[in-house]
C-alpha cells in the first residue's frame, strides 16, 4: 500500500524524502515553528519547549517513519513537506524505539516527558480508532517554511493525497490542537469528529476526518 502511494506521489511531481535528507526535513520543520507556541509540546516537556527539545522530537519521528510512512516535499529544496501514515500502522515497538534513537531521546528529554508522550499517543490512538477503525491515511505532519508561506504549498501537498484517499475508498484523518487549524482543514472537506481536552491537560484535541469518497474541495 505504501509503495503504491509513493509511486502515485512521484507521478504527481513531488519529492520523496530520502534517508540522507532527514536532517534537512527536520530543519524545515523547526523553521516552520518559528516562535509559535504549541501547547502540546509544552505539555510534553512540562515547560516552554526549547528548540533543542523540539529538534530531538522531530528527528526521532522522521527517523522512525522514514520507511513506514509517506513523506514528501514540494521539491528537493524542501520548502514544505507532509507525512502520511498508511492504514493499519501500529504503534512503536520497544525494539524500534531503541533502534531509531529512543534511548537518546529519553536521555535528552527525560523519563517524565516520555511518559507524557506515551500517554498522549495512547489517547490519540483511541480517538483515531473510534473514528476510523484504523483504516485511514493519517495526516501526521504538514509544515511550511515561513518564507514559503502564502504560496499555497499546503494545499498543493494535501490535495493529491486527498484525491488518492477518495479514489481508494479510504478515509483521511488528522488531529490538531489549534482552533485556527480546524477552520483551515474544514475548507478541504474535513469534518470534526472529536473535540475534547487530552485527559489530565487543558490542551484541546480535535480529531478530523474526510469521509470515504468525498469530493475534495478545490481551494488553495
Placement of each model-derived feature along the sequence:
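Conserved acetyl-CoA-binding loop-helix of GNAT-fold acetyltransferases
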Residues: 144, 150-163
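Conserved GNAT acetyl-CoA-binding A-motif
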Residues: 135-137, 164-177
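Conserved GNAT-fold acetyl-CoA-binding loop/helix
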Residues: 36-58
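Conserved active-site alpha-helix within GNAT-family acetyltransferase domains
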Residues: 167-169, 178-195, 201
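Conserved acyl-donor/pantetheine-binding loop and adjacent beta-alpha core of acyl/acetyltransferases
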Residues: 81-143, 149, 199
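A short beta-loop-alpha structural element at the N-terminal edge
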Residues: 12-35
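Conserved beta-strand-loop-alpha-helix junction that forms the acyl-donor binding cleft
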Residues: 140-149, 173-182, 199-203, 210-212
Amino acid at each position: 500500500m505504501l509503495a503504491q502511494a509513493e509511486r502515485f506521489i512521484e507521478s504527481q511531481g513531488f519529492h520523496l524524502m530520502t534517508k540522507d535528507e532527514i536532517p534537512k526535513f527536520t530543519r524545515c520543520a523547526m523553521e516552520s515553528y518559528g516562535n509559535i507556541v504549541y501547547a502540546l509540546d509544552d505539555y510534553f516537556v512540562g515547560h516552554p519547549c526549547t528548540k533543542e527539545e523540539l529538534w530531538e522530537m522531530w528527528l526521532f519521528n522522521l527517523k522512525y517513519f522514514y520507511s513506514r510512512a509517506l513523506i514528501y516535499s514540494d521539491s528537493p529544496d524542501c520548502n514544505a513537506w507532509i507525512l502520511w501514515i498508511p492504514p493499519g500502522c501500529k504503534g512503536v515497538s520497544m525494539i524500534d524505539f531503541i533502534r531509531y534513537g529512543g534511548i537518546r531521546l529519553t536521555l535528552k528529554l527525560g523519563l517524565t516527558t516520555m511518559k507524557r508522550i506515551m500517554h498522549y499517543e495512547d489517547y490519540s490512538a483511541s480517538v483515531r480508532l473510534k473514528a476510523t477503525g484504523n483504516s485511514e491515511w493519517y495526516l501526521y505532519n504538514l509544515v511550511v517554511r515561513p518564507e514559503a508561506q502564502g504560496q499555497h504549498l499546503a494545499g498543493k501537498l494535501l490535495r493529491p493525497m486527498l484525491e488518492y484517499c477518495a479514489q481508494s475508498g479510504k478515509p483521511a484523518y488528522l488531529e490538531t490542537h489549534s482552533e485556527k487549524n480546524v477552520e483551515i482543514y474544514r475548507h478541504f472537506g474535513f469534518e470534526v469528529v472529536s473535540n475534547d481536552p487530552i485527559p489530565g491537560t487543558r490542551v484541546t484535541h480535535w480529531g478530523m476526518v474526510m469521509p470515504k469518497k468525498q469530493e475534495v474541495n478545490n481551494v488553495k
